[in-house]
Curated annotation (Swiss-Prot):
The modification Phosphoserine is found at S174. It comes from Bos taurus (Bovine). Signal peptide: none annotated. Accepts ubiquitin from the E1 complex and catalyzes its covalent attachment to other proteins. Catalyzes 'Lys-11'-linked polyubiquitination. Acts as an essential factor of the anaphase promoting complex/cyclosome (APC/C), a cell cycle-regulated ubiquitin ligase that controls progression through mitosis. Acts by specifically elongating 'Lys-11'-linked polyubiquitin chains initiated by the E2 enzyme UBE2C/UBCH10 on APC/C substrates, enhancing the degradation of APC/C substrates by the proteasome and promoting mitotic exit. Belongs to the ubiquitin-conjugating enzyme family. This is Ubiquitin-conjugating enzyme E2 S. Keywords: Acetylation, ATP-binding, Cell cycle, Cell division, Nucleotide-binding, Phosphoprotein, Transferase, Ubl conjugation, Ubl conjugation pathway. It catalyses: S-ubiquitinyl-[E1 ubiquitin-activating enzyme]-L-cysteine + [E2 ubiquitin-conjugating enzyme]-L-cysteine = [E1 ubiquitin-activating enzyme]-L-cysteine + S-ubiquitinyl-[E2 ubiquitin-conjugating enzyme]-L-cysteine. Component of the APC/C complex, composed of at least 14 distinct subunits that assemble into a complex of at least 19 chains with a combined molecular mass of around 1.2 MDa. Within this complex, directly interacts with ANAPC2 and ANAPC4. Interacts with CDC20, FZR1/CDH1 and VHL. Pathway: Protein modification; protein ubiquitination.
Amino acid sequence: MNSNVENLPPHIIRLVYKEVTTLTADPPDGIKVFPNEEDLTDLQVTIEGPEGTPYAGGLFRMKLLLGKDFPASPPKGYFLTKIFHPNVGANGEICVNVLKRDWTAELGIRHVLLTIKCLLIHPNPESALNEEAGRLLLENYEEYAARARLLTEIHGGAGGPSGGRPEPGRATASGAAASTADPTAPGGPAGAEGPMAKKHAGERDKKLAAKKKTDKKRALRRL
């Protein structure tokens, strides 16, 4: 995609540069901005999935594209990370009012990013680009949330409700296997059957000693 920097007036470029620099140094909570040094009109962004939503624990990559008419016209927003959301189309396009009819030249990039993050908390089924997600949100929220969580786990880097960390008190399959396979682990087979194992070891040593004694007697008889 061609850069729009050359199409923007110098004073707009300075304003964009100033805001992007501020956003990079002091981003909104849960949002990080990665400016494109070669193209200031192509902003790469990551947004953390808000807690209490099906997107919690996920990290979503997106981009904002500033057109040649910016700020008279709103930027275009796209999710680069696949997400199940009513207001995100199959190509990642984001449908939110602030990027359309509610846009004014006074609104800045920070406002856009905060609005998109809020969209993860409060989806709007009335302006759905993903009709299935919009329908489920209205008719069967549990199914909608399950689908959203699944895609978040697959594509957003989430491993569960705590973002990939096992929940307290819940053993993982690998942890259980490790405990079973390690006979020296506390509470494992060796720990639970220590006295019995020692008893068997003692009996085995006695049998070996008796066998050696018998073999020695047989050897003496041959002499």
